Amino acid sequence: MTKFSFKKWGGYSLLFIEIIFFILFPERIQASTLVLAGINQNPNNELSKLLPFVNYLAHHLQSDGFDKGSVRIEKTIPPIATLMKKGKIDLFLGGPFTSVALHQLAKTNFLLQGITEGSDKHYSVIFVRNDSSVKHLKDLKGKVIAFENPLSTFGYSLPKGLMLERGLKFKLLKTDKENVAPDEVAYQFSNDDENTILWVKKGKVIAGAVDYEIYKLQAKETLDQLRIIEKTISLPPYIISFRENLSPEVVSHLKEVLKKMHQTDEGKAVLKNLNEIWKFQDFSQRTLSPFMKLYDSFSGEFKVK
């Protein structure tokens, strides 16, 4: 006759309970690290901004099973898209261009917009020297314009998209000695908005495109040397997105934490370090519709590599 062992069956019962809990609440057991991704050509610089931010979020999401934060920095979009689809990256913080590209590649969801103090929407300006003969965008045919870098929203994709809509054709200059056809606009990457403004001032290029907020800040007392010939639509400066299949409970708590960050001294300090973001707030995704249409129409021009 087999004797009943309470200890043995008690162990099975405990195991059964753990399995049920694992099935019902996988986020609470598996996800101990909240992973945030960013894109930058200088990983160390971006890491110093993003790590305090994601650690702050993880600390306030302990009830959801997170005990620490981690940052993944890439120089291009596809690696982040791949990892988000695999569930290895939870969040992404970036500008509209990179956020929309990830949405298209990895089916990410937009959560909130990050705004700077005094402005919840930014726009690009296309400018020339005040003594330039260029008055309109069409006058840039046969000339050279400076953009920031291929992943910049306000320093590249937004102003270039506007010019594409106006029927202008582009050519990327690989050297300063290349010829520019009279029916196309040539462009070079300055790799920094400050460089873009400087290049225009010194006559290295005829025109430049930057975020208007940066234009006001960088040009400073020399604004009278420059002249704006066109401006773009307005977009949120920053967007935080989350991966597909992230728990709705986590998303809800995350949204609450983000929207309250600016109300505490600790949160304010973290935000100030994060590209001078003032606070996170709701936004209508319809705000992005014109840009998403632009992205779809000219996706071949904005090669996501």
Tell where the protein language model's regions lie, with residue ranges:
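N-terminal secretory signal peptides that target proteins for export/translocation
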Residues: 1-8
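Bacterial N-terminal signal peptides
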Residues: 13-23
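Extracytoplasmic small-molecule ligand-binding "clamshell" domains
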Residues: 31-100
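Periplasmic-binding protein-like
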Residues: 32-40, 112-128, 180-183, 218-262, ...
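Bilobed "Venus flytrap"/periplasmic-binding protein-like clamshell domains
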Residues: 34-60, 97, 122-197, 269
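Ligand-binding clefts/hinges and TM-proximal coupling segments of bilobed small-molecule sensing domains
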Residues: 67-70, 147-162, 258-305
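Alpha-to-beta junction loops
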Residues: 85-94, 143-145, 184, 192, ...
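A ligand-binding cleft/hinge motif common to bilobed small-molecule-binding domains
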Residues: 93-106, 159-165, 197-225
